[in-house]
């Protein structure tokens, strides 16, 4: 084969027997993910993979570290073409024939969550191939519907920068310092207290020794994680006279009406809608129960960080436009032009990122669930320190 790249050369053992129910996928890795898989193979540990619809998460355990990657599954050969997986059986006698294992119908693209990559990989460029090759969504109107062609953008962990810091909001850290650090997460919202990172259990252990200020008696739960805003959260109802029309697009999706409201992210559920985590996670009474809560916390927090990064990156453009339109007087030509621009960009956004509403609701749910679990853990630890 002429023009074959060096990365595609070499020999590989066929470790499975093709069968009728065998699914073949084209795997796309960036350099960080490839190195992590190689390290995992050297350590002879088994990775853990979890699917959630057309996306999922891959965890590669190792000695003293744990790599977490997200991935999406998309179709191959959407333009009428197709891809087949072939292999060549190398034998000492007889011709070396090519054998077709089957068609590659789906492609699995893996991105890295940089906060969980071991130290040797942190020096690598964290921009994935998808970041370098893909264009911004607002620069293209003719992209096919499906998964957003945008790579995961990393949101830094406030606790990862300094392992010796205490929890934000404690007596050993001024609130002003936390406000500055939290400003990059969200605008027009009170600073929120982050949760410990799932990258390392050691971080959580170090945070336990930090003094915690007592909350007011009526406020049992600590402030929650930073939460990504809606794409049009910067637009108030007064600034958006056409919001009812925006919410009724070609597919009749009326859920947009909720996301246009500034208060939509903070609306409390109705009394009859009791979240399941309130029933599942009650007051902690033992160390074993605390450990189980912490394990559940780590699992959900890994998913939350990925969703928060995706939702936050996607809505950043509309946050800027919302702040810009607030500075203009209603009824002026400038206000009308910008309003029309927001409408057009949002239509392109919905076409490019159809799963945004679903991911945002999931992110908000995890936001509240993790805050509830963390509050129970801190309450139990504070009770034990006092005894």
UniProtKB/Swiss-Prot annotation:
The modification Phosphoserine is found at residue 240. Signal peptide: none annotated. One of its GO terms (molecular function) is cis-regulatory region sequence-specific DNA binding. Residues 275-385 form the OCEL domain. It is found in: Nucleus. PROSITE patterns: OCEL. Residues 257-271 have a biased composition (Low complexity). Residues 240-251 have a biased composition (Acidic residues). Keywords: Nucleus, Phosphoprotein, Transcription, Transcription regulation. Belongs to the ELL/occludin family. Enhancer-binding elongation factor that specifically binds enhancers in embryonic stem cells (ES cells), marks them, and is required for their future activation during stem cell specification. Elongation factor component of the super elongation complex (SEC), a complex required to increase the catalytic rate of RNA polymerase II transcription by suppressing transient pausing by the polymerase at multiple sites along the DNA. Component of the little elongation complex (LEC), a complex required to regulate small nuclear RNA (snRNA) gene transcription by RNA polymerase II and III. This is RNA polymerase II elongation factor ELL3. It comes from Rattus norvegicus.
């Amino acid at each position: 084969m002429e023009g074959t790249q060096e990365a595609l050369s070499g020999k590989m053992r066929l470790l499975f027997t093709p069968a009728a129910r065998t699914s073949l996928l084209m795997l796309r890795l960036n350099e960080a993910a490839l190195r992590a898989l190689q390290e995992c193979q050297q350590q002879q540990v088994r990775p853990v993979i979890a699917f959630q619809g057309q996306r999922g998460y891959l965890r590669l355990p190792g000695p003293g570290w744990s790599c977490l990657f997200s991935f999406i599954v998309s179709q191959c050969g959407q333009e009428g073409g197709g891809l087949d997986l072939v292999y060549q059986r190398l034998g000492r006698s007889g011709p070396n024939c090519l054998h077709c294992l089957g068609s590659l119908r789906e492609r699995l693209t893996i991105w890295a969550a940089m906060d969980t990559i071991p130290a040797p990989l942190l020096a690598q460029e964290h921009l994935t191939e998808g970041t370098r090759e893909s264009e911004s969504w607002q620069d293209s109107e003719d992209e096919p519907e499906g998964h957003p062609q945008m790579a995961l953008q990393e949101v830094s962990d406030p606790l990862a920068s300094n392992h010796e810091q205490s929890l934000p909001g404690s007596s050993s850290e001024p609130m002003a310092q936390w406000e500055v650090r939290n400003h990059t997460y969200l605008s027009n919202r009170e600073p929120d207290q982050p949760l410990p990172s799932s990258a390392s259990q050691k971080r959580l252990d170090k945070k336990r020794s930090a003094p915690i200020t007592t909350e007011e008696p009526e406020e049992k739960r600590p402030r929650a994680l930073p939460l990504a805003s809606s794409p049009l959260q910067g637009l108030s109802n007064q600034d958006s006279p056409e919001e009812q029309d925006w919410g009724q697009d070609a597919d009749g999706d009326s859920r947009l009406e909720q996301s246009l409201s500034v208060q939509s992210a903070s609306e409390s559920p109705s009394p009859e809608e009791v979240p399941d985590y309130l029933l599942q996670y009650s007051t902690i009474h033992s160390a074993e129960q605390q450990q189980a809560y912490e394990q559940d916390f780590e699992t959900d927090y890994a998913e939350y960080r990925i969703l928060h990064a995706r939702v936050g990156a996607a809505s950043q453009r509309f946050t800027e436009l919302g702040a810009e339109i607030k500075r203009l007087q209603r009824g002026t030509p400038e206000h009308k032009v910008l309003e029309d621009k927001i409408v057009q960009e949002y239509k392109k956004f919905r076409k490019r990122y159809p799963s945004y509403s679903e991911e945002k609701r999931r992110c908000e749910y995890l936001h509240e669930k993790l805050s509830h679990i963390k509050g129970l853990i801190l309450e139990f630890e504070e009770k034990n320190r006092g005894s």
